[in-house]
Regions:
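Short amphipathic alpha-helix that is part of the acyltransferase structural core
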Residues: 22-57
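A short helix-loop-beta-strand connector motif used in the catalytic cores of GNAT acetyltransferases and
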Residues: 52, 66-78
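A conserved beta-strand-loop-helix scaffold within acyl/acetyltransferase catalytic domains
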Residues: 60, 80-81, 86-97, 104
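Conserved acetyl-CoA-binding loop-helix of GNAT-fold acetyltransferases
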Residues: 107, 113-126
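Single conserved hydrophobic/aromatic residue that forms the stacking wall/gate
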Residues: 134-144
Length: 144
């Protein structure tokens, strides 16, 4: 049995092109995962990804996860709702292109359909522009 998988891409060249979410929920906070913790990325990737057929990292060893999130070009942000982890996004800065990729973004199943997705996406886009300004020139060029 084969399943058709579609990938969609969004390109935003300026924050003025962004239609922001209407509100940040009162009990929600998005913050950088610092220090980086591969277990958090692995948890979200597997938990959210099983619903969306994310498979490329399922074969990764802990060493591969650690190498990935240790790369200075990779930043992980966590959405917390009432202090519980609800979702995440990963940003990857591509120095040579002067652009930032939202590598993965998602909400845990129990937080879906609660008006959090637009808030998470808006934050990911805003932070992707910040990443362009603050990523170190000394960042390692390898990803994955």
């Amino acid at each position: 049995m084969s399943i058709k998988v579609e990938r969609n891409y969004l390109e935003i060249n300026s924050l003025k092109d962004l239609k922001k979410s209407k509100f940040p929920p009162d009990d929600c906070l998005i913050g950088l995962s610092d220090p980086a913790d591969f277990q958090i990325n692995k948890f979200f990737y597997k938990s959210i990804g099983k619903e969306h057929r994310w498979t490329d990292r399922l074969v990764w060893t802990d060493k591969q996860w650690i190498e990935y999130i240790s790369n200075q070009k990779v930043k992980t942000y966590i959405l917390k709702k009432a202090n519980d982890m609800a979702g995440y996004f990963e940003l990857i800065f591509h120095k040579e292109k002067k652009e930032t990729e939202i590598a993965y973004l998602g909400l845990l199943k129990e937080y879906q359909n609660k008006n959090l997705g637009s808030f998470l996406l808006t934050s990911a886009i805003k932070n992707s522009f910040s990443c362009l300004l603050y990523t170190s020139d000394a960042a390692d060029d390898r990803i994955g």
